[in-house]
């Protein structure tokens, strides 16, 4: 932390472009909410919230799910069941590496298709959990971790770029904050509550401290949800790809 703080003093200065007098709404960044008047921006923020729900699902239940196999005799001694933290760490590695793929995909396919790829990746993320196991099917868990990088990076980066391209410079910072609010704020909160209800319906904590139950049904529901979101996004969100704008 101290090293990063020291490093920040070496960064170049950035001018702050702001009007001399701002209203209270502008000062608080609330002026970005006027973007909801635009159908395209409103749809984008709604889908951002829905994707934020998916993120919270995987953050909250990936590790308890993998660890739950320790409560099953046939998987109790498998490498996967006993190394949930190691398996989930592949998600962070994938997240870091997938950043490198984004410039190519954005230029080749455009913002909408990259967002759609991220949504399909969420379907695979949850679906692979539903059909995999820590024994012979552990490769499905590993593949799910790899897919996570695409699911997380592709939407967050392309979404931030979309906000930058489609909003006025005077409210870009507020608009980016609204994007984060919809994904990591409202979306994450709703996702926590909704996912909790689903898991509680199909699973229970046993005497050994493992969350056991019908996880296959849980992940099928989550995958179906992600698929519905992807289909609706493909149908209703309209955005033309202009490679020359991405290049700039």
Q: Language-model segments: which ranges?
A:
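A membrane-interface helix-boundary motif in multi-pass transporters
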Residues: 197-226
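Short amphipathic helix-loop junctions that connect adjacent transmembrane helices
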Residues: 60-84
């Amino acid at each position: 932390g101290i090293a990063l703080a020291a490093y920040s003093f070496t960064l170049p200065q950035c001018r702050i472009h702001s009007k001399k007098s701002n209203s209270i709404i502008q000062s608080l960044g609330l002026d970005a909410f006027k973007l909801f008047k635009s159908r395209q921006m409103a749809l984008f923020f709604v889908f951002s919230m829905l994707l934020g729900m998916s993120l919270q699902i995987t953050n909250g239940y990936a590790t308890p799910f993998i660890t739950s196999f320790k409560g099953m005799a046939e998987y109790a001694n498998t490498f996967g069941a006993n190394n949930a933290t190691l398996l989930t760490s592949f998600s962070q590695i994938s997240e870091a590496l997938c950043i490198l793929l984004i410039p190519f995909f954005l230029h080749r396919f455009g913002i909408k298709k990259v967002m759609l790829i991220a949504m399909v990746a969420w379907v695979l993320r949850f679906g692979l959990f539903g059909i995999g196991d820590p024994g012979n099917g552990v490769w499905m868990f590993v593949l799910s971790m790899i897919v996570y990088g695409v699911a997380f990076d592709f939407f967050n980066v392309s979404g931030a770029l979309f906000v930058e391209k489609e909003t006025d410079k005077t409210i870009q910072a507020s608009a980016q904050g609204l994007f984060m609010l919809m994904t990591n704020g409202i979306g994450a909160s709703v996702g926590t509550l909704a996912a909790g209800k689903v898991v509680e319906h199909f699973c229970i904590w046993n005497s050994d401290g493992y969350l056991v139950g019908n996880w296959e049904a849980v992940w099928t529901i989550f995958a179906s949800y992600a698929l519905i979101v992807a289909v609706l996004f493909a149908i209703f969100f309209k955005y033309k790809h202009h490679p020359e704008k991405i290049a700039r």
